[in-house]
UniProtKB/Swiss-Prot annotation:
Gene: leuA
CDD domains on file: DRE_TIM_LeuA
Entry keywords, A to Z: Amino-acid biosynthesis, Branched-chain amino acid biosynthesis, Cytoplasm, Leucine biosynthesis, Magnesium, Metal-binding, Transferase
Organism (species): Acetoanaerobium sticklandii (strain ATCC 12662 / DSM 519 / JCM 1433 / CCUG 9281 / NCIMB 10654 / HF) (Clostridium sticklandii)
Cofactor annotation: Mg(2+)
Protein name stated in the entry: 2-isopropylmalate synthase
Binding site for Mg(2+): 37, 241, 243, 277
Length: 567
């Protein structure tokens, strides 16, 4: 790769820059350019019905300025503008914005298209960059300024002839980031001299990174330079229009706001020419997650995705910030464990949202908690236990969680795929709950040996290897007594390490579930669970499940030993 064919971008000489120490404290003025900049970048541009639907959705979100197109560019663009105006699509508090070049026939057609609207921004632009001037237009700086001033005067005169509309004027030095900064300030000030903004009639100076050419801090330097050098700054709305060619359109916009800008033009999901525009969803939610009202409604992200994908035939990437299908998903075991603990803490104290790996509460944008933790071979106990707890009301003891996590991630590895909540639950049931072979409890009865029920006597009928046995024993509680009664039959000592239980929160019939952790003579741990409408029965069934796992493990070892001896 011949990297020497490229040259680095020149840095801006800006002494005592202030933007690095500033922070964004409020939402900017937003302008959606989905229907113009976004639409012109589509393989198949939107038709009239799609545009109308998209416009209505942008209004619903709270946009107060919407760039609807370039009405002089085509009959389709002109018809869309007239339809919005004549059929009453534009609310009283919403301003439509249209684009025009600095040519009199185009400006005249633009004002004709706007006839009858209450509020409109007329957006004038011409290319100012060194490359565009020298290669495309072959204009001098003076000729470039003359073109901008000509358009500014024509727009001002036509606005005076249409007093029924409240016009705002906007000027963009296209390819601003490739323009010499002193010249950018000069041409903008020449336009400002024509329009003569006031406190009540401000002018928008839009500073686009038409092609993103440098790091975001360079754009911020350029914006701060312009804010310092624009005439009548207090009557100017400085606007940003960042593209994403280097992948930093959002960052450049945020730094541009820190540098003094007041307004942002962008699109939903960053749709736009080449690699796209600055993503207003991304920008707005970045504000929201810092405790700042974005002044736009992102509460139903799924509807936004649906409208966007149907209208543009583009897909939202599964990793797209805030919106993608995998944004609120953790496969990693350590991440899952941290999320589980964070969610548990949120249930106890919730003044601020603070959950590891989740900078946003999914419910705030209409997402659910269900897909937060998803299980594959990289997952661990935290993820498995979170899903079983959230979906099925199973509060599994900590050491039991480790064993279940190992079993279920091994299953996922074997299947070579992610597994869902229902499948996780089925694996858990099959592996641990109410296991009845080779040992089965047919019936039992208990009685207290002392008045405090500390010492309990149990009689039971069990079936082991297809044979029935009647057993009895005493123990420190029902579970201990039952384990003591089985020692002679199964030929193993059994130690109870942990026993817990709770009522199940899943299903129409109330049930109890018990969890048992047992230890054999060599110190190996085994886990089982049992369910019943009776707490006592559920605990004994849990013991049977754990013992069956112990027996089956021993049988597997014995078979392995026999095979080694034969070999």
């Amino acid at each position: 790769m011949n990297y020497k064919k490229y040259k680095g971008y020149e840095t801006i000489v800006l002494e005592d820059r202030n933007w690095p120490s500033r922070k964004i404290e409020k939402a900017p003025q937003w302008c959606s350019v989905d229907l113009r900049d976004g639409n012109q970048a589509l393989i198949t541009p939107m038709g009239l019905k799609q545009k109308l639907r998209f416009f209505e959705y942008l209004v619903k979100m709270g946009f107060k300025t919407i760039e609807i197109g370039f009405p002089a560019a085509s009959d389709t663009e002109y018809e869309f503008t007239r339809t919005l105006i004549e059929e009453g699509y534009i609310p009283e508090d919403v301003t439509i914005q249209v684009l025009t070049q600095s040519r009199i026939q185009i400006i005249n057609k633009t004002f004709e298209a706007l006839k009858g609207t209450k509020n409109a921004v007329v957006h004038l632009y011409n290319s100012t960059s060194t490359l565009q001037r020298e290669v495309v237009f072959r204009n001098s700086k003076e000729e470039t300024i003359e073109l901008a001033v000509f358009g500014a005067r024509a727009i001002k005169e036509l606005a005076l002839k249409n007093p029924e509309t409240n016009f705002t004027f906007e000027y963009s030095p296209e390819s601003f980031t490739g323009t010499e900064m002193d010249f950018a300030a000069e041409i903008c000030n020449s336009v400002i001299d024509v329009w003569k903004p006031t406190k009540d009639k401000k002018v928008i100076i839009n500073l686009p990174s038409t092609v993103e050419m440098a790091t975001p801090n360079t754009y911020a330097d350029q914006i701060e330079y312009m804010c310092r050098n624009l005439k009548s700054r207090e009557n100017i709305i400085v606007s940003l229009h960042a593209h994403n060619d280097r992948g930093t359109g959002v960052a450049a916009t945020e730094l541009g706001l820190m540098a003094g800008a007041d307004r942002v033009e962008g699109t939903l999901f960053g749709n736009g020419e080449r690699t796209g525009n600055a993503d207003i969803l991304n920008l707005g939610m970045n504000l929201y997650t810092q405790g700042i009202n974005p002044e736009l409604d992102f509460s139903d992200i799924n509807s936004m995705i649906e409208i966007y994908e149907e209208s543009t035939a583009m897909n939202v990437h599964p990793r797209h910030p805030y919106a993608g299908d995998l944004v609120f998903t953790a496969f990693s075991g350590s991440h899952q464990d941290a999320i589980k603990k964070g969610m548990a803490r949120m249930n106890k104290q919730a003044q601020y949202w603070e959950v590891p790996y989740l900078p946003l509460d999914p419910k705030d944008i209409g997402k659910s908690y269900e897909p937060i933790i998803r299980i594959n071979s990289q997952s661990g106990k935290g993820g498995v236990s979170f899903i079983l707890e959230q979906n099925y009301g199973l509060y599994i003891p900590k050491d039991f969680q480790k064993d279940a996590g190992r079993v279920i991630t091994a299953y996922s590895d074997k299947m070579q795929t992610e597994i869902g909540a229902e499948e996780i639950y089925e694996v858990f049931l099959n592996e641990y709950v109410d296991i009845r072979t080779p040992l089965q409890l047919n019936y039992h009865k208990t009685q207290s040996v002392d008045s405090d029920w500390d010492l309990v006597f149990i009689e039971a009928e069990i079936e082991y290897n297809m044979q029935k046995h009647y057993v009895q024993a005493e123990g420190n509680g029902v579970v201990s007594a039952f384990c003591n009664s089985l020692k002679e039959i199964i030929g193993m000592d059994i130690d109870i390490v942990d026993y817990r239980g709770h009522s199940m929160e899943y299903g129409t019939k109330a049930k109890a579930i018990s969890y048992i952790e047992l230890k054999n003579e060599t110190g190996e741990r085994f886990y089982g669970a049992g369910t019943s409408s009776s707490v006592g029965k559920s605990s004994l069934r849990a013991v049977v499940s754990a013992i069956n796992k112990m027996i089956l493990a021993q049988q597997t070892k014995d078979m392995d030993t026999q095979e080694e001896d034969i070999a």
